[in-house]
UniProtKB/Swiss-Prot annotation:
Keywords: Cell projection, Cilium biogenesis/degradation, Cytoplasm, Cytoskeleton. Component of the tectonic-like complex, a complex localized at the transition zone of primary cilia and acting as a barrier that prevents diffusion of transmembrane proteins between the cilia and plasma membranes. Required for ciliogenesis and sonic hedgehog/SHH signaling. It comes from Xenopus laevis (African clawed frog). Belongs to the B9D family. Part of the tectonic-like complex (also named B9 complex). The lineage of its organism: Eukaryota, Metazoa, Chordata, Craniata, Vertebrata. It is found in: Cytoplasm, Cytoskeleton, Cilium basal body. PROSITE patterns: C2_B9. The keyword Transferase does not apply. Residues 8-126 form the C2 B9-type domain. GO terms for biological process: cilium assembly; smoothened signaling pathway. This is B9 domain-containing protein 1. It comes from the Eukaryota. One of its GO terms (cellular component) is cytoplasm.
Length: 198
């Protein structure tokens, strides 16, 4: 008698498509994945850094990266479902690389193509003196480990300011989730477009 699967797989491919930061230009991004203890990457790249991009000429002035992302995870349970953490950097008036935004989003649970717009934020100094000193020295407040963005511990005391957004597209494939008793709801409800008309 053959035993059933003991793990399920989550494969995600896609791209960090674009960003909107109205006040900034010549930006690049870094990404990394944060996941629970029962999760393990089996293939793909866990961290990456994009090229520098400039705003498109035209009305919207979008920063376009189209930077590919691909990774496969295995796990025994959905606790600690993976998140992608994105950090955006660019030059300040002195030419120093400074953080322009942090953001995170869970990878989609259901198979298929998904697009997510991630609101970005930056940490702020807690006083005017610290703000002036950090500007003068060229060292803005930033997280020593950007993965803290995906965790809740200690974030309630962090002062942040919203700044820009990043658009990411995902193509998600799962294997053996249903065999292990997890229902993502995608295969039980056919799309209205695929149902025959009476």
């Amino acid at each position: 008698m053959a035993s059933g699967p003991s793990v399920f797989l989550l494969n995600v491919s896609g791209q960090i498509e674009s960003a909107e930061f109205p006040e900034f230009d010549d930006l690049y991004c870094k990404y990394s994945f944060v996941y629970g203890h029962d999760w393990a990457p089996t293939s793909g790249i866990e961290e990456g850094i994009s090229q520098i991009t400039s705003k498109s000429q035209g009305g919207k002035q979008t920063l376009v990266w189209n930077f590919p992302v691909e990774i496969t995870f295995k796990s025994t349970n959905p606790y600690g479902w993976p998140q992608i953490v994105i950090s955006v950097y660019g030059p300040d008036v002195f030419g120093n690389d400074v953080v322009r935004g942090y953001g995170a989003v869970h990878l989609p649970f259901t198979p298929g193509r998904h697009t997510r717009t991630i609101p970005m934020f930056v940490p702020e100094s807690s006083s005017r003196l610290q703000r002036f000193t950090s500007w003068f020295m060229g060292r803005r407040p930033e997280f020593t480990d950007p993965k803290v963005v995906a965790q809740g511990e200690g974030r309630e005391v962090t002062r942040v300011r919203s700044q820009g957004c990043v658009t990411v597209s995902f193509n998600v494939v799962t294997k053996d989730l249903k065999k292990l008793g997890y229902n993502t709801g995608s295969s039980d409800f056919p799309s209205a477009q695929l149902m025959p008309q009476p």
